[in-house]
Amino acid sequence: MNTHFTYVLQCADQTLYCGYTTDLEKRLATHNSGKGAKYTKTRLPVKLLASVNFDNKNDAMSCEWWFKHKLVRQQKLKLIKNNLIKEKFLEYLLAKQK
């Protein structure tokens, strides 16, 4: 079984980038080589701030979407600092099911 990751990068201009991968080290290297996402190409170098692992692609990609579209920057930074991304994402999923 593959591990699927949602990851958060800090770009050189201090902006955040969130993505999905199955190979965290390779993806970070790809970003820093300038061959990653269009957004990060002009904001190098990038550094990994956080990563969350999931057992399946759907959960990891759903977490990426939630992080990008449901949170503002201050919320994102607080979750990163307190290592609570996965916990709060799972709470979001549970609340959505009710």
From Swiss-Prot:
Family membership noted in the UniProt record: Belongs to the UPF0213 family.
PANTHER family (alphabetical): UPF0213 PROTEIN YHBQ
Pfam family name, one: GIY-YIG
Protein name listed in UniProt: UPF0213 protein llmg_2010
Protein source organism: Lactococcus lactis subsp. cremoris (strain MG1363)
InterPro entries cross-referenced by the UniProt entry: GIY-YIG_endonuc (IPR000305), GIY-YIG_endonuc_sf (IPR035901), UPF0213_domain (IPR050190)
Highest rank taxon of the organism: Bacteria
Domain GIY-YIG stretches: 2-79
